[in-house]
């Protein structure tokens, strides 16, 4: 869906011709990929809608993950014949015709384990193998074993996996890191991109693009051979994110690509479908109905696109933080996504050079440099003194500070003076007793205050360290690890998100109960333990006292979270 073209021709951004040709070649390849599996809402039509609306299961994801026992067309035909008969029982019909997902066995860790021992013991518990799946299963098969987040998340998730892999590498499980990279490469080869997760209902979108960073991580162990091996898949993923760029005029958007009036190319989150999400069917329908002033399809796409961002949901995407139906993800250019695209271009340049293609390496460097200029021009709020998202409707950078603002530092795309301002903004507005706040807004959504998420803690920590802001970085790690340790001491588990307004409490909000496991928290915790403890004295639990800054420690903000951005 393109926005209207401007009335007069605009100057085209300089994009190397060979990159355009490469996009064209990959689009032909994409047309040759196998027919993708259909999601359950399409396979089962009115039956799927009726089951979800009947709320037979507390979690809408349960039926989305159910496996038909026979051809869905036959099940649907039987349903149409039986549904109006006297005494028809929908729950009985579902139980007869579907195999419901099994609840995972409750893991009881051995007593007396340290935090590190607990995490190391969880890796095999969270490992799954689905080389073969049932014919009509929404679960997509993968050739190698993989680590899932835990809880209701029975499949592998794209951006979660990078932070999980950091922990696997820290534990010495390079074989598992290699397996997961191979799985994601398989998805790119099979579907043309990495879906949100390995479910048919996730195929219409991706997630924050960390594949190139995964390959770079693997290269720490295998050297440039990993970069050369996965260069074709990295190029194909890049083409997916840039699909449609060759036909864009200034001021237009196409799928995941945005071309601003001066020709600057940036990216946004996008889902190819504009229907309710099968895993949150009833919730999405209710959200759309609650705002009759907007087309339901527009709201559905913005809900789906927010899921593609990983931040589902957050005031970051909304006009009114208290009303989810005002979200408009597709009209926002995210600072974190474009930072990751910059990093992808830099890694593509490095991989191309390793493969002996210096000309292509130079082209990717040109693209990375152009994107870096775009980030500095459009995704920096000079008045506020922090990085932020760009609003395509108002044609202005937004004012809200979020933890996503640390991504330019994480990928080394930030100017030094701006990184220093980000350090000040972070400790003034986001740092709390239990770690880094996601935003300063209390909306009831899970990607808002008072929740803190492991991946954002690590991005901030690494990003600030990249620019010499070690004290703030160490404080973030220290406060978050203390939160993780206190929760573990009380409950003997690591969880998906934490309440950072205090320590020792899991986070709340969102569409489902708090999940434990938890892949990315495990990975980030291991990285942070090795960061705050000296190599000559590694620690298995979080030390009782701050290990680095003994005095003049940065004090976390004690300001009450504000109700509006």
Curated annotation (Swiss-Prot):
Residues 1-30 form the signal peptide. It is found in: Periplasm. It catalyses: alpha,alpha-trehalose + H2O = alpha-D-glucose + beta-D-glucose. GO terms for molecular function: alpha,alpha-trehalase activity. It comes from the Bacteria. Its EC number is 3.2.1.28. It is an enzyme of class 3 (hydrolase). Residues 548-565 have a biased composition (Polar residues). GO terms for cellular component: periplasmic space. Residues 540-565 are annotated as: Disordered. PROSITE patterns: TREHALASE_1, TREHALASE_2. GO terms for biological process: cellular hyperosmotic response; trehalose catabolic process. InterPro entries: 6-hairpin_glycosidase_sf, 6hp_glycosidase-like_sf, Glyco_hydro_37, Glyco_hydro_37_CS, Trehalase_periplasmic. Monomer. Belongs to the glycosyl hydrolase 37 family. Provides the cells with the ability to utilize trehalose at high osmolarity by splitting it into glucose molecules that can subsequently be taken up by the phosphotransferase-mediated uptake system. This is Periplasmic trehalase. It comes from Shigella flexneri serotype 5b (strain 8401).
């Amino acid at each position: 869906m393109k926005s209207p073209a401007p009335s007069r021709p605009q100057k085209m951004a300089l994009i190397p011709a060979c990159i355009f040709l490469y996009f064209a070649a990959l689009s032909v390849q994409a047309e040759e990929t196998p027919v993708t599996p259909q999601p359950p809402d399409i396979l089962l039509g009115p039956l799927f809608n009726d089951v979800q609306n009947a709320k037979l299961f507390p979690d809408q994801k349960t039926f989305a993950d159910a496996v038909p026992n026979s051809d869905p067309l036959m099940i649907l035909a039987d349903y149409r014949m039986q549904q109006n008969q006297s005494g028809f029982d929908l729950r009985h019909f579902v139980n007869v015709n579907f195999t419901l997902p099994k609840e995972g066995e409750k893991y009881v860790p051995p007593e007396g384990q340290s935090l590190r021992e607990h995490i190391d013991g969880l890796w095999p518990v969270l490992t799954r193998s689905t080389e073969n799946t049932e014919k009509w299963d929404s679960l997509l098969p993968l050739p190698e074993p993989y680590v899932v987040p835990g809880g209701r998340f029975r499949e592998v998730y794209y951006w979660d996996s990078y932070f999980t892999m950091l922990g696997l590498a820290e534990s010495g499980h390079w074989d598992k890191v290699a397996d997961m990279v191979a799985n994601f490469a398989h998805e790119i080869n099979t579907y043309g991109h990495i879906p949100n997760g390995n479910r048919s209902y996730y195929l219409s979108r991706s997630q924050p693009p960390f594949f190139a960073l995964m390959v770079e991580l693997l290269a720490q162990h295998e050297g440039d051979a990993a970069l050369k091996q996965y260069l074709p898949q990295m190029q194909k993923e890049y083409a997916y994110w840039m699909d449609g760029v060759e036909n864009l005029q200034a001021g237009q958007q196409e799928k995941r690509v945005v071309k601003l009036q001066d020709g600057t190319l940036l990216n946004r989150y996008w889902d190819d479908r504009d229907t309710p999400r099968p895993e949150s069917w009833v919730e999405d329908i209710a959200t759309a109905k609650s705002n009759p002033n907007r087309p339901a399809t527009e709201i559905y796409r913005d809900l789906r696109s927010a899921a593609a961002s990983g931040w589902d949901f957050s005031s970051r995407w909304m006009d009114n933080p208290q009303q989810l139906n005002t979200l408009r993800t597709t009209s926002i250019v995210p600072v974190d996504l474009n930072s990751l695209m910059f990093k992808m271009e830099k890694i593509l340049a490095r991989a191309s050079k390793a493969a002996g293609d210096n000309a292509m390496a130079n082209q990717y460097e040109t693209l990375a440099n152009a994107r870096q200029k775009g980030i500095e021009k459009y995704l920096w709020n000079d008045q506020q003194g922090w990085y932020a998202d760009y609003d395509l409707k108002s044609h202005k950078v937004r004012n809200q500070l979020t933890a996503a603002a640390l991504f330019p530092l994480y990928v080394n795309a930030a100017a030094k003076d701006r990184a220093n301002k980000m350090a000040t903004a972070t400790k003034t507005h986001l740092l709390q007793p239990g770690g880094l706040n996601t935003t300063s807004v209390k909306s009831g959504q899970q990607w808002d205050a008072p929740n803190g998420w492991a991946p954002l803690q690590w991005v901030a920590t690494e990003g600030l360290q990249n620019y010499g802001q070690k004290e703030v970085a160490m404080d973030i790690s220290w406060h978050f690890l203390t939160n993780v340790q206190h929760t573990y001491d009380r409950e003997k588990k690591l969880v998906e998100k934490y309440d950072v307004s205090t320590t020792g409490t899991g986070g709340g909000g969102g569409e489902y109960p708090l999940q434990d496991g938890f892949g990315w928290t495990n990975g980030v915790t291991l990285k942070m333990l090795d960061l705050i403890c000296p190599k000559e004295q590694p620690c298995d639990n979080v030390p009782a006292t701050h290990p680095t800054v003994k005095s003049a420690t940065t004090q976390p903000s004690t300001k009450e979270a504000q109700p509006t951005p």
